[in-house]
């Protein structure tokens, strides 16, 4: 009889908690101390297998397996007797009661096999045969028991080499294959494959299946029959037993894929043929039921665990891909979730084995798949797996994508939009691999990407290369824009910090790109897309000479390395812009040459006059010029330059930055603000825009788009439309005249002339109306550019306060920035400016280049005037006032500073309609005054203490 503790453990075996079941099973076996307890437990466990209570069957089966594994004295015959006794349905049982007994017997037989009790010396061939017979009988009870019963037999076959009567055991199982009911079933195929793995010294006869010729089901000539069996066709077709459809695929599929991995059978059908006949044509055929296709998706998931880069292409067959795309395209499809599991598996496999990414991608995007795979299927499968490829795979992907760019199918070659979309998609996909966090950046493929963009963006395509159709200007411009986007990413701090290989992260990639361009230019086979006149060539050569000197200094680890790196980057990017045909960049190059000369050339410094702009003024103008362009790459370049030279900024260069803040946010005042851009005023005067048009401006996104978007041909198309309408009017008039004219009449009478004039006037009115709309649109875009420009300039100021908190020149930014916050109509500028003050003011010390007290006082007065105009400036104005008061605290100007507050306070009280001060400015002033009072009290106390101490000591001495 069991103890109380053991009885409690039996109860815990029924728990739905797996951890509790496992723990209870182990404790129960450990607690058995005598034969009586062992006998009781064995009887209780075999009997409990038929229980339908919670998870009793699972818990009791685990405990029984553990008991049989640990205890060597238990005989298989005894356990089998108990199993049959307690788990045989008696009477006229139906439904769940009947199923409980079937499952109880199945779980018990599993415990016998998994415990290995049949490998003990005490076990006999009769025990082995009895287990096989019971499993075979049980498999015939219900169709849904067949597969799992045979799976237990498969596991039993694996133990045959360890059994003392192995040859007889082999014969007992091999005999099952001689019955058509087994041999022409999925279970029989699985059993055959298991038996072929038994060592030759154990086999007493050949493994053979009835009604198969040749005997091996995976022989090429048997594939059609195998296909019928594997999709479980009617028994009349296969000659075997008919199995009802089950949700899970048969276990045999695992053994089939393992057989193709082992390749021990010389007559094995090629995997390509097997997949095509059995899976693609058998299970994924257009006439297959949804149930079969559901199986097919499971088979695909399983196959991905076994295929290699050599044969993975075979499983991406035509019918499978059609079915996958079809069911992924709509969430309401019956097999949508099954298809989604396949995509998840593909992504998982790609992570585990990067060498598979390229062969997967080439089939998803190929003829059987679709270039639009992600868009058609509403997934991001291609986008997610491409960056996971290894180095060789990514290089292959680039060549694949480049082939899509260079060669378009005949059916779309004449469709300009389709061609441009295809080419843009391919180049964007290349770029997305670089930008993805999933890709491991390696120099060979990063260089390859840049070289592709340079070769086709800056040079004519060699005649030896076949491009169908020929590249348009838009396509070539697209390559240049993608190059700039790639360089923008490679120059970003996020990329550099993510690289453990500092050689890759610290590399000046724009310089690398420029070097490759110059190498290509040297070859007579390559022709630049743009031609430069002698004057431009002279400027370029001069800049290249300076760049060469800069690079030599960097290689020698010379002084001012950070500034030299900044100049190397600046030269490289601007030269790339010049080679792209940007005429404005030529002037920038000359400014950079001048600036470099003033910064690093001692002779130039000596010869410069006071009237000439300083190096920092020139550099600041260059930075502002670059910053005015909507390019994320140039913005990052300016940030790097500004950080490198911020300590060298002088008052004049700071005023240049402040001038941008002071500029009005209107179209007519923006002339000259943007390099190389003509600003048109609206035909109806200056266009007013709501501040809502500028809320939530994401400058990074806009700039990134500017690096990505292709050149629009809108102006050209508008002109073509106008010419077309004019031609139509004139042609109609001419035709009418020809119909009506006689030899004595004029070519066109007055009535016809008036009619023609009216039609022409109508065409021009339409054109003028469209032109006015276009001008209004341009005006809006210009205003948006002004706002974006100011946002970027505010970021420069924030950068300066961050990197130069001790430099008093930062004082120069206070009033211009505060005035801009007050005057702007755009919320984004107001919030951006206030954020700078909120985040940086408390950290400013201004111990160097400290502003004069007189200037500080004037600034304080100005701040209070501005704060009185707008209550929302209260917090910001108070913070600035506090900073300025601290600078005046120990100067004779403190009294006048306090009087500024007094004057503002009186205005706030006496003229509430005119003064809009926020009360916080006065609260903060009182708190500051209290702190100053406490400070002076402490100073006075400290000063008087030594005198008192000295007086007492003198008295003590006199005494």
UniProtKB/Swiss-Prot annotation:
Residues 937-948 have a biased composition (Polar residues). The keyword Lipid biosynthesis does not apply. Residues 936-959 are annotated as: Disordered. GO terms for molecular function: nucleotide binding; rDNA binding; RNA polymerase I transcription regulatory region sequence-specific DNA binding. Keywords: Nucleus, Phosphoprotein. It is found in: Nucleus. Residues 950-959 have a biased composition (Basic and acidic residues). The modification Phosphoserine is found at residues 742-743. Plays an important role in the regulation of rRNA transcription. Binds to rDNA promoter fragments. Interacts with cdc10. Belongs to the MYBBP1A family. This is rDNA transcriptional regulator pol5. It comes from Schizosaccharomyces pombe (strain 972 / ATCC 24843) (Fission yeast). The lineage of its organism: Eukaryota, Fungi, Dikarya, Ascomycota, Taphrinomycotina.
